[in-house]
């Protein structure tokens, strides 16, 4: 969320041998949103609520509860190396502390409590490699669907981002930041076919790398123009999922 995945993405994930899951901010937003507990007056929160309504067309409350019932941080051992995994900070899955210009003391929180040798986090939608104060490795794999760039030239490349870490009995063999092409036109057509709310916002993210999810006036005008406000208000008043 936001996107076309819904049932399809859950079914795909169920086929993969996933051994580590952590709680992200979007899972929190979905959990609160389906309970209609977000701010119903703020355009960005109404944007989230309308997407929660959309998700509920295919995914049950029980499945959303399972998505939400994940730790903020976990650790895995690879030989002598301890790897910490979190969406953002160990005790907070939202905010701007870990953007690329973040304070060193905030990045050190990823590798000190509890201590680990390598920290992997998400949230900022940017591929990143940097170090803790004591030399620990801190990595971010980037974003598959909505990479973020401040630089206009870098923003021209919006391919899906991945990171592959390879370990052997001696330690970390390789770090591989990947970018993979996908059919953006096909995804946008699918979004149209599935009547994805706020299609214009999705288009801007996938095609131009511009993200409007916090642009209050833009979201307000779009919701009124396209009828998302009307659809959301009907759902909020219905008392039904």
Please state what every model-predicted region is:
Residues 57-68, 73:
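Ligand-binding beta-strand-loop-alpha-helix segment within the catalytic cores
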Residues 2, 20-25, 86, 118-123, ...:
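Active-site neighborhood of phospho(di)ester-bond hydrolases with catalytic His/Asp-centered motifs
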Residues 1-57:
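Core catalytic region of metal-dependent phosphoesterases/phosphodiesterases
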Residues 72-80, 129-132:
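Short acidic-hydrophobic surface loop/beta-edge motif
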């Amino acid at each position: 969320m936001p996107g076309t995945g819904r049932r399809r993405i859950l079914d795909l994930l169920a086929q993969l041998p996933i051994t580590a899951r952590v709680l992200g901010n979007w899972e929190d937003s979905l959990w609160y949103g389906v309970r209609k507990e977000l701010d119903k007056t703020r355009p960005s929160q109404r944007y989230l609520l309308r997407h929660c309504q959309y998700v509920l067309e295919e995914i049950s409350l029980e499945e959303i509860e399972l998505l939400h019932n994940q730790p903020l941080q976990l650790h895995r051992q690879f030989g002598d190396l301890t790897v910490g995994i979190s969406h953002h900070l160990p005790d907070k899955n939202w905010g701007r502390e870990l953007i690329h210009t973040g304070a060193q003391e905030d990045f050190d929180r990823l590798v000190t409590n509890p201590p680990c040798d390598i920290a992997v986090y998400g949230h900022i939608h940017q591929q990143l490699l940097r170090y803790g104060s004591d030399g620990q490795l801190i990595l971010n794999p980037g974003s598959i669907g909505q990479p973020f760039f401040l630089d206009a030239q870098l923003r021209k490349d919006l391919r899906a981002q991945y990171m592959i870490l390879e370990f052997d009995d001696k330690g970390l063999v390789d770090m591989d930041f990947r970018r993979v092409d996908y059919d953006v036109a096909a995804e946008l057509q699918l979004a149209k076919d599935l009547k994805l709310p706020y299609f214009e916002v999705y288009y801007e993210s996938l095609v131009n790398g511009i993200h409007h999810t916090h642009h209050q006036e833009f979201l307000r005008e779009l919701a009124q123009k396209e009828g998302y406000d009307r659809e959301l208000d009907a759902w909020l008043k219905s008392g039904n999922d």
